[in-house]
């Protein structure tokens, strides 16, 4: 996406060109085959009829649609507009108004041949001797008009940055294409809001490593805070010469500069720092933990007012842990081994009922995961069972998928469960399925909540917890670290002790027991199959590592015999390595979550 609305107060056409430029420098982190394949959606907002806003709109549309986009060879096939960005009212006899500046918000889209070629801002600390290189499409102008720095000092003085040359954007695409094909690029971030300093800090946050910026500039303020278009890439120092050659070939050699050194091989991980040098002099140095707390402070204060204040404080305080390695993985099995392969080779594909109800939305990913593991995934809606088009007798495995059945208005999963409990035929059908020793059942997220309401029908489900509103009092959508526990769950066979990241997305995921006696009985049964853990692998009650405040950090559980497994996290959303926003480099096609589905296939033999 791209938007540079504040610039419209200085130069409306420049704000439009910069919005497109920002959208493009964002999307070029992905391996786009050709710039012509990029399509734009334009959202125009203006106070039509007010002052000179109509003239600004005309000139900006002309600059964007009639000049820049044709020069770039891209088009804007879709968009929308809001033409009444002004409100007028009277207060105590005085006429008042509030008018928004002309705004253009650009969304860029492009097909990809392989999403695994997408670069992220995460600095690679395992690579020896790396550096950051700036490709400055502003070509040293460093215009500060409309910048975040100007907003801090309440001034709009100065000249607005601009995309002065469409040919430079085309050249940038060519440079990235060539460098990517030679495997030179390790990390990527665009320069935008906040300027070069913010870009470097965000890359350091993502990589959890120190960065030393070295500015060969007599005007460090402009160099650090101008929001000219540009990108910053991480490359190996050994590739520096080749990258310079490619930049020269693209016509960008004179605006390509080495700007920083990156700490390598985990050096400084315990207390990494950002240091800014200019002409050999240290201008600034601070720990990443202090910078990240500053970066998060405004959000923290808002969160403390809106959400559970204790959770807000715990999340903010977690930034003080300088030893926190962030997301990590430690597995007790080979993630690249396909243990289901021998069973798939037989040609037998057990049928799994991918069960859904009104409001459920996770059935496609779930079917894909089971299909990859060697099952025949069949879409089964509750109405299919109610009207007799399908019966659970046809299946050896049942999976209840995630979503928001009946909008959670009867409690998460409650309405779905009552459809079964209050219908004699359905109740008998589910009870018979759960009692059959040759069946497996899985409930994920909303399906987990639903199956927990059916515990009276499930053998060995005594003392199961219910799932209540998150402690944070908010919907939680994030990657959380979990640890596989020692349980009888058929889905988690031979995974005990493994720690990895998994997707969570729920508003009512807090496992809660009706009494301390139930909690003690549950613990004695070894039915806890998965727990939320911190970065060191220890179960935790602290937010956000425990995203919902679950009792005893319970993320998943099983029946005593292990045939029925429930979990709030979503393994089906991250079963491929490429679905994870971060993963170790030695993971090939599959992620640890895929093992759950392959264990189910192995269980069937």
Task: Show the residue positions of the predicted features.
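N-terminal beta1-alpha1 cap of cysteine-dependent amidohydrolase-like domains
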Residues: 278-444, 448-460, 468-476, 551, ...
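Intein/HINT protein-splicing elements and their conserved insertion hotspots or analogous self-processing inserts
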Residues: 5-8, 32, 58-59, 75-225, ...
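Solvent-exposed alpha-helices and their adjacent loops that cap or buttress functional pockets
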Residues: 32, 69, 96-100, 122-126, ...
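Proline-centered loop/turn at the N-terminus of a beta-strand
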Residues: 39, 75, 438-440, 563
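A glycine-rich phosphate/pyrophosphate-binding beta-strand-loop-alpha-helix module
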Residues: 9-86
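Short hydrophobic/aromatic beta-strand micro-patches
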Residues: 232-236
């Amino acid at each position: 996406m791209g938007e540079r609305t504040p610039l419209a107060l200085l130069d409306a056409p420049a704000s439009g060109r910069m919005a497109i430029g920002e959208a493009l420098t964002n999307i070029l982190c992905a391996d786009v085959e050709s710039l012509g394949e990029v399509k734009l959606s334009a959202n125009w907002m203006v106070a039509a009829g007010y002052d000179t806003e109509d003239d600004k709109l005309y000139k900006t549309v002309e600059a964007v649609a009639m000049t820049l986009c044709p020069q770039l060879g891209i088009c804007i096939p879709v968009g929308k507009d809001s033409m009444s960005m002004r409100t007028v009212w009277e207060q105590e006899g005085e006429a008042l108004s509030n008018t928004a500046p002309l705004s253009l918000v650009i969304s860029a889209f492009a097909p990809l041949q392989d999403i695994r070629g997408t670069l992220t801002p995460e600095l690679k600390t395992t690579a020896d001797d790396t550096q950051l290189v700036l490709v400055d499409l502003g070509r040293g102008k460093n215009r500060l008009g409309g910048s975040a720095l100007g907003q801090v000092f309440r001034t709009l003085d100065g000249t607005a940055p601009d995309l002065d040359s469409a040919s430079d954007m085309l050249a940038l695409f060519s440079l990235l294409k060539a460098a990517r094909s030679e495997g030179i690029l390790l990390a990527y971030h665009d320069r935008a809001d906040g300027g070069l300093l913010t870009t470097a800090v965000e890359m350091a946050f993502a990589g959890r490593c120190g960065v030393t910026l070295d500015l060969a500039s007599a005007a460090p303020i402009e160099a650090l805070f101008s929001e000219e278009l540009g990108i910053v890439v991480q490359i190996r120092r050994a590739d520096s010469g080749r990258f310079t050659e490619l930049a020269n070939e693209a016509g960008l050699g004179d605006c390509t500069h080495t700007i920083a050194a990156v700490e390598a091989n985990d050096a400084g991980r315990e207390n990494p720092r950002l240091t800014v040098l200019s002409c050999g002099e240290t201008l600034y140095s601070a720990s990443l933990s202090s910078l990240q707390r500053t970066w998060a402070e405004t959000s923290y204060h808002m969160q403390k007012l809106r959400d559970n204040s204790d959770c807000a404080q715990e999340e903010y305080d977690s930034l003080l842990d300088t030893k926190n390695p962030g997301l990590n993985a430690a597995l007790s099995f080979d993630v690249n081994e396909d243990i289901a392969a021998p069973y798939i080779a037989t040609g037998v594909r057990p049928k799994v009922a991918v069960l859904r109800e009104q409001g459920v939305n996770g059935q496609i990913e779930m079917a894909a995961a089971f299909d990859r593991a060697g099952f025949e995934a069949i879409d089964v809606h509750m109405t299919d069972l109610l009207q007799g088009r399908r019966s659970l007798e046809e299946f050896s495995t049942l999976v209840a998928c995630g979503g928001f059945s009946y909008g959670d208005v009867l409690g998460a999963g409650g309405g779905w469960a009552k459809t079964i409990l209050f219908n004699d035929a359905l109740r008998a059908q589910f009870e018979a399925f759960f009692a059959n020793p040759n069946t497996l059942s899985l409930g994920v997220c909303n399906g987990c909540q639903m199956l927990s309401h059916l515990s009276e029908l499930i053998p060995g489900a005594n003392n199961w917890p219910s799932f209540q509103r998150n402690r944070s009092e908010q919907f939680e959508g994030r990657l959380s670290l979990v640890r596989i526990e020692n349980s009888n769950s058929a889905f988690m066979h031979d995974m005990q002790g493994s720690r990895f990241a998994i997707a969570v997305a729920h508003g009512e995921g807090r496992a809660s027991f009706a009494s301390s006696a139930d909690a003690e009985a549950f613990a004695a049964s070894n039915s806890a199959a998965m727990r939320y853990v911190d970065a060191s692998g220890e179960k935790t009650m602290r937010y956000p590592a425990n995203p919902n405040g679950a009792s005893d950090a319970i993320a998943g559980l099983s029946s005593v015999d292990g045939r029925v497994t429930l979990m709030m996290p979503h393994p089906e959303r991250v079963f491929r390595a490429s679905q994870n926003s971060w993963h170790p480099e030695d993971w090939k096609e599959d992620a640890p979550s895929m093992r759950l589905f392959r264990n189910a296939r192995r269980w069937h033999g």
